Amino acid sequence: MQAILETVSNLLPYHLLSYGALLGTELFQSFVNTKICYQALPMKEFLALQKRVFPAYFRCQVGLVVLTAVTRPPYSILSFSQHIWDSVPLIAVGVTGALNCAMNEDNSSTTDPAKIQQANKTFSRNHAMSIHLNAIALVATVWYGFTLSSSLLNGL
């Protein structure tokens, strides 16, 4: 019973769970959910679904990064002061997620061909940027897994 109480009061299990949720969410959204929806839905419905899913996904991503940072053992976020470079991947994930959250899409309905062409160009640019930011976040999340493993192997 004592061992369970010590574990429950330790940051490590919460840190591992939040990091695992972050990595799992990124992998699932990037490689499973988007691919299946793209293949199964007509384009109009796929785009409508993505407009609803992605903002929630990016908010969850940022929230999980914060949760991962504040549960870093042994001293919460202050633990990064001892190993400042361990925070770099999480900062990268947080920044890329926040940038994706900040992208605003104009949903106004217009029939002006020039405005439609400009909106399509803006959407294409934002979509490409979002894909690249998500790839950077995924690489940074895996990178953090290796820095965390190194810290655990060296006794934090």
Curated annotation (Swiss-Prot):
Compartment(s): Membrane
Listed GO CC annotations: membrane
InterPro entries with a match to the protein in the record: TMEM205-like (IPR025423), Xanthocillin_Biosynth-Assoc (IPR053009)
Pfam families recorded: DUF4149
Glycan-linked positions: N107, N120
Signal peptide, first to last residue: none
Topology term for the membrane: Single-pass membrane protein
Transmembrane segments: 131-153
Annotated pathway: Secondary metabolite biosynthesis
Keyword Glycoprotein: yes
Recorded coiled-coil stretches: none
Keywords associated with the record: Glycoprotein, Membrane, Transmembrane, Transmembrane helix
Name of protein: Xanthocillin biosynthesis cluster protein D
Organism: Aspergillus fumigatus (strain ATCC MYA-4609 / CBS 101355 / FGSC A1100 / Af293)
Lineage: Eukaryota, Fungi, Dikarya, Ascomycota, Pezizomycotina
